[in-house]
Amino acid sequence: MSGTDKVRVNVSQTAQTPLHTSAKLPKVGVLLVNLGTPDGTSYGPMRRYLAEFLSDRRVIEWSRLIWYPILYGIVLNTRPRRSGRLYDRIWNHENNESPLRTYTRAQGEKLAKALSDQPNVVVDLAMRYGQPSIESITDRLLQQGCERIVIFPLYPQYSATTTATVNDKFFEALMKKRFMPAIRTVPSYEAEPVYIDALARSVEKHLATLSFKPEVILTSYHGIPKSYSDKGDPYRQQCLETTRLLRERLGLGEDEMRATFQSRFGPEEWLQPYTDETVKELAKNGVKSVAVLNPGFVADCLETVDEIGNEAAEEFLENGGENFSHIPCLNDSEEGMKVIETLVRRELLGWV
């Protein structure tokens, strides 16, 4: 038989055998990731959580030779008990978990329901620090047959300390795999109309429930060291942009809505103005009514419920203020879920 005849036979045989035995669509994973939470409020769980969090080089950029003796010699021997007492004040004792885990799970469940028109989409959630870990949930998505994954760091404003470290950990998990799925990561959305509108509606709804009208509304964001911003982290500018757009959407003046930064840690200068100092100054200057919201947090947690709802409120009232209200995060509200669903559907275009 000639070479030409052999080719003809092979082509004929190939033509009779379909390349794909079925038209089944490959699964697409959607992974929601938030900061994280301890598994409990006692010393052990708190120490494990803080050790993982404060060992992240994206979070603490100091030389390990300087930082580790401080971390393991001082911080992890003193801070777990104090942080545990704070967490205990907001702990969801019914489910034995922090509000962050409660709300993030609800967000995942509601997103899965909203995407039920896409049967090949699998929604799951993970935490950057603590459980469920990014690595374990990445494994689960791959085991379910996900050939493409959209990873959604749940941070409206980008920072290397938040969004970047989530992506770092995700790709670190994939480095151990033979098969690497196609990846998309949801970018920051500090100026997205659906997000600004959701914040505005949330503020309007909350203010309608109050017996007073706030003279000043603070948009309080988690701070980062000023040196990180000076080196090029766009976080501060994105926070200010969110506040500017929200202020315009609500028709407020610059004195009526101001951006501040909270949760500073350590001796370094952080982004200013500081939230705690601002509420104290407002009270001392005669402002009697204040409201605070946290646009950078998609779910209520220790930094919002306790640091703002309790500590900032106490600072304001103890220094002459009369009315203080914390505006809840978007959480799994209708407005909040519209933001998450809109951004996820946009990233799924061409994949489903």
Curated annotation (Swiss-Prot):
Chief location of this protein within or outside the cell: cytoplasm
Lineage: Bacteria, Pseudomonadati, Pseudomonadota, Alphaproteobacteria, Hyphomicrobiales
This protein's encoding gene: hemH
GO annotations of cellular component type: cytoplasm
Residues engaged in binding Fe cation: H222, E303
Keyword Disulfide bond attributed: no
Protein name according to UniProt: Ferrochelatase
PANTHER family attached to this UniProt entry: FERROCHELATASE, FERROCHELATASE, MITOCHONDRIAL
Catalytic activity: heme b + 2 H(+) = protoporphyrin IX + Fe(2+)
